[in-house]
Design a protein with these regions (language model features):
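Hydrophobic anchor at the beta1->P-loop junction of P-loop NTPases
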Residues: 2
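P-loop (Walker A) phosphate-binding loop of NTP-binding proteins
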Residues: 5
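Conserved lysine of the Walker
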Residues: 10
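Hydrophobic positions on the alpha1 helix immediately C-terminal to the Walker A/P-loop
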Residues: 13, 17
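Conserved nucleotide-sensing/catalytic segment adjacent to the nucleotide-binding pocket
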Residues: 24-87
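Conserved AAA+ ATPase "sensor/coupling" helix adjacent to the nucleotide-binding pocket
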Residues: 47, 120-125
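ATP-dependent NMP and nucleoside kinases share a basic, alpha-helical "lid"
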Residues: 72-121
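Small-molecule kinase domains that catalyze NTP-dependent phosphoryl transfer to phosphate-bearing small molecules
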Residues: 94, 123-166
Length: 166
């Protein structure tokens, strides 16, 4: 699993690892929304993590991002069981995963760089920067209380990659 704050490079790293291991990726963006920073976990745990750990296919309803806010659920997805699956997204290496993950990776970058990456990601909309700043404060509080970074098996700093131009 790849955890870390928004804009840190989790998705980029997940794609690299997925390609290397020929493993599917489950994105936490299918569960989280701007209004649901950390409360998505019970649905993910029941529909995905517990199911896959039991050796069964995971069937879950993905978040609908067509309104840019992720305020509703959309299509149903099926992730066939696989010996290796990359789970990528904010707070996915939270305390509740202790003893349930093979490997936890913490991905990080300075806050200013993460915000800049967030501003070039996706489409522009009024209030985007304020949403990102609020989200980053929620992340800081969650990660401090959860002690997520200190439980990681490895820490990857993606500062060297800068801000994407496209």
């Amino acid at each position: 699993m790849r955890g870390g704050p928004s804009g840190s490079g989790k998705s980029f790293l997940a794609v690299q690892i997925s390609t290397l291991l020929d493993a599917p990726i489950i994105e936490i963006d299918d569960f989280v929304s701007w209004d649901c920073f950390a409360g998505w976990w019970p649905r993910f745990d029941a529909q995905v993590l517990t199911t896959l750990l039991a050796g069964r296919d995971a069937v879950y309803q993905a978040r609908d991002w067509s309104d840019w806010y992720g305020s509703s659920l959309g299509e149903w997805k099926t992730q066939p069981w696989s010996a290796t699956i990359v789970v990528e997204g904010v707070t996915c290496t939270r305390r509740q995963t202790i003893g349930r993950l093979v490997y936890a990776v913490w991905v990080q970058a300075p806050a200013e760089l993460r915000l800049a990456r967030g501003m070039v990601r996706g489409r522009a909309f009024p209030g985007k920067e304020e949403l990102w700043q609020r989200w980053m404060r929620e992340e800081d509080a969650f990660f401090a209380a959860d002690d997520t970074r200190n439980r990681a098996d490895i820490i990857v700093d993606t500062s060297v990659f800068g801000v994407p131009t496209a």
